[in-house]
Amino acid sequence: MANIKSAKKRAVTSEKRRKHNASRRSMMRTFIKKVYAAIATGDKAAAQNAFNEMQPLVDRQAAKGLIHKNKAARHKANLTAQISKMA
């Protein structure tokens, strides 16, 4: 454990941010899983609705630096391709 006052504060702040980021990342993954689940059921309308809910959330997390912008783009591109392949 840190001995210097500023290092102690950084440790506390860092842990607080880690928990906050973990929560945001978990929420984002849940929304992505909802899209995959909708695709698995074969319901294109439900998949599109789930994607429309997921897209701004992923973009926001990328803009805030939680994930890299290319990772956000990759998720969106893969899911869009899978949805468009549906009958």
UniProtKB/Swiss-Prot annotation:
Keywords: Ribonucleoprotein, Ribosomal protein, RNA-binding, rRNA-binding. GO terms for cellular component: cytosol; small ribosomal subunit. GO terms for biological process: translation. Residues 1-27 are annotated as: Disordered. The keyword Calcium does not apply. The keyword RNA-binding applies. GO terms for molecular function: small ribosomal subunit rRNA binding; structural constituent of ribosome. Disulfide bonds: none annotated. NCBIfam families: S20. Binds directly to 16S ribosomal RNA. Belongs to the bacterial ribosomal protein bS20 family. This is Small ribosomal subunit protein bS20. It comes from Erwinia tasmaniensis (strain DSM 17950 / CFBP 7177 / CIP 109463 / NCPPB 4357 / Et1/99).
